[in-house]
Design a protein with these regions (language model features):
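Short, surface-exposed beta-strand-loop junctions and turns on beta-sheet-rich folds
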Residues: 47-48, 97, 127-130
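A short, polar/proline- and glycine-enriched secondary-structure boundary/capping micro-motif
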Residues: 51-54, 101-102, 129-134
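A short C-terminal boundary segment appended to hydrolase-like catalytic domains
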Residues: 118-134
Length: 134
């Protein structure tokens, strides 16, 4: 949205200028501790080039093992993922707003991460904009 590709959307008269300003002021990533465990939240990847699409089958997924965190929460692809890569639990909750087509149906999803047990619960829900398949 903030890249040159999002210029048209930013200029749309329905776009809230204050929200765009707020978004531009946000950091690219957030790090924090939960119960002594380090969590990294990022939209796409913490390495260059930013904005890479890391799908569950992507070879670059292994690069998350280099991240100094116990958990990495990322998005961008809208494809749900919960996988340990090296010592890092990598989670993509999917998408609650714009669905992902997994080959047989459009899926909306979210995830709950238990930082104590390190279990990830996937929550799927229907998108009324698309007919039910599968």
């Amino acid at each position: 949205f903030l890249s040159s590709a999002g210029a048209r959307a930013r200029e749309d008269k329905k776009t809230d200028r204050e929200l765009v300003k707020w978004l531009a002021e946000q950091p690219l990533q957030r790090e924090f501790l939960v119960g002594g465990k380090k969590v990294l939240m990022i939209h796409s990847t913490p390495w260059e080039p930013r904005g890479s699409y890391i799908f569950p089958h992507s070879e670059q997924l292994e690069r998350f093992a280099e991240v100094e965190a116990d958990f990495v929460l990322y998005g961008h692809t809208h494809a749900h993922l919960a996988r340990r890569v090296g010592g890092v639990l990598v989670v993509n909750p999917g998408a609650a707003g714009e669905p992902y087509y997994n080959g047989d149906a459009w899926r909306l999803s979210s995830a709950i991460l238990d930082t104590v047990t390190e279990e990830v619960k996937r929550i799927d829900f229907p998108d009324s904009r698309y007919p039910a398949t599968a």
